[in-house]
Amino acid sequence: MAFDKKLLDIVACPVCKGKLEYDKVAQQLICKADKLAYPITDGIPVLLENRALPLTESV
């Protein structure tokens, strides 16, 4: 199942409530403010702080 980009208009980072960006290749939603990546599993974003991955400096 593919991620529906329309969700970007309504979802927010659970930590800072900021805007998220979609990374199609990595299948993640990115919060640049907190430098966190939230996984997308079967088209569903997993917006749980304890499941977020820290971004590397290259992202």
Swiss-Prot record:
Superkingdom to which the source organism belongs: Bacteria
InterPro entries: Trm112-like
One protein family per Pfam: Trm112p
One cellular component (GO) term of this entry: cytosol
Family to which this protein belongs: Belongs to the UPF0434 family.
PANTHER family: PROTEIN PREY, MITOCHONDRIAL (PTHR33505:SF4), ZGC:162634 (PTHR33505)
Protein name in the entry: UPF0434 protein SO_2800
